[in-house]
Amino acid sequence: MKRFFAIALIALIVFSSCGSNSVMEPKRVVLADTAQGEYGTGAEIDPAISLVGSRQLLSPEQSESEPAKTVTIQGKEYTGKHHSVYLSPFYNGDCDEYKCDFESGTLYFFIDRTYGEVVYYYFMYNDATKGEMTYEACRNIADSALKEANVSGEYIHDSFNERDYADSFGCYEYVYYRIMDGFAVFDMIKISVSSENGQIVRYILADNHMFDGIERISYDEASCKKAVEDYAADYADKLSANGKKCEYEIAAAYFARLKDGSCGVIYYVYFKQYAGAEAPDRYNMAIKLFVELE
């Protein structure tokens, strides 16, 4: 009861800022995820802003969680033992993780700590192999699963965040992000489909409650983009210190709501360094930036 009261109070406070009629402006730009790739600048992640969740191997007593849960997934019942607590950096994202071993593998499923819903599950099979089903055929299965899902809001396909697991785990991943007031938001649904038999082997909608209580989003896109461009240009200059020309591209932007209820925009920025006269055929590093809004 106390937990729900606290959530309602936070939502009321946050609604006055994130969901008001005023247009939010950028407060500052921070590095929110470490640089990935061949080069780095030595820049450090702001400790106050983290976009990476963490797992804690707590006992059910320590986490005040049920020691076992029975859920129905794809028409079949599974009973799992409490395995860990996942602490999300985003609003309403904390989950309890349960583990269920069965004959051909292991199922992990996650229960939302606020609403008690299954928001994430994945199967780990002992003999997962790449099958003959194509990306397009598996995509049709994922699209159908999305239509049947009981989720609120409008979601569209987003290949930018997809990963190809066909060779390593025998499945294709499909990502759908939510649109609110014309903005892409960091509420994504991920569905992975086996290329061997068309089974859904992973399903994630862990951030579906991120924007509960918010009816309207309004922020100054131009000012946010300019702030990110300034940061990225400075970052590129540092990467060019070794004498190699560097270019950057803002690849994607998603409005997000952090655990404390504050709002901002996540930007994916890619960098490409020239090895000589010609640029490489792909970007060789990326960072995530977070623009705090006020």
Regions found by a protein language model. Give the residues of each.
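Long, terminal "pre-/pro-" and other extracytoplasmic accessory regions
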Residues: F4-F5, C18-E294
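C-terminal motif of bacterial Sec signal peptides marking the signal peptidase cleavage site
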Residues: I13-S17
